Amino acid sequence: MSSFLNFNMNKEMKSYLLGFLFSSLLTTLPFLLAIEKFFCSEVNYIIFLLCAISQIIIHFVYFLHLSFDPEERWNLITLLFVIIIIFIVVFGSIWIMFNLNHNTM
């Protein structure tokens, strides 16, 4: 029983370390590109966006342990629901502020 727990712990620790290494690399890369100015600003924006999206995916996979297994379908449905609610709140607030600005002018 204890060897099973040690194997599972090592697998989990390896997952956390890989996630930490990937996320720290994807954090330092945009800082390096912004400081050193290797590319023009448009290319930097695209690289920043790709790093941010890939870092979100890495956090979901390595730290939240989301997968596409049939047993974990509810986790993905919950994540989709949270993303929809955040989208409604953020863009609804922007829409309301735009209309308030338009009505006061």
UniProtKB/Swiss-Prot annotation:
A Gene Ontology BP annotation from the UniProt entry: aerobic electron transport chain
Going by the UniProt record, its keywords in alphabetical order are:
Cell membrane, Electron transport, Membrane, Oxidoreductase, Transmembrane, Transmembrane helix, Transport
Q: Which residues lie on this side of the membrane: Extracellular?
A: 36-45, 97-105
Q: Which residues lie on this side of the membrane: Cytoplasmic?
A: 1-14, 67-75
> Which chain regions cross the lipid bilayer?
15-35, 46-66, 76-96
Q: What is its main location?
A: membrane
Question: Entry's NCBIfam families?
Answer: CyoD (TIGR02847)
According to the UniProt entry, the coiled-coil residues are none
Per the entry, what this protein does is: Cytochrome bo(3) ubiquinol terminal oxidase is the component of the aerobic respiratory chain of E.coli that predominates when cells are grown at high aeration. Has proton pump activity across the membrane in addition to electron transfer, pumping 2 protons/electron.
Q: What is the protein name given in its UniProt record?
A: Cytochrome bo(3) ubiquinol oxidase subunit 4
- Signal peptide location: none
A GO molecular function term, named singly, is: cytochrome bo3 ubiquinol oxidase activity
- Report the membrane topology from the UniProt record: Multi-pass membrane protein
Q: State the family named in the UniProt similarity comment for this chain.
A: Belongs to the cytochrome c oxidase bacterial subunit 4 family.
Summarize the subunit comment. Heterooctamer of two A chains, two B chains, two C chains and two D chains.
Its localization reads: Cell membrane
Q: Which PANTHER family does the UniProt record give?
A: CYTOCHROME BO(3) UBIQUINOL OXIDASE SUBUNIT 4
A Gene Ontology term for the protein's cellular component: cytochrome o ubiquinol oxidase complex
Listed disulfide bonds for this chain? Answer: none
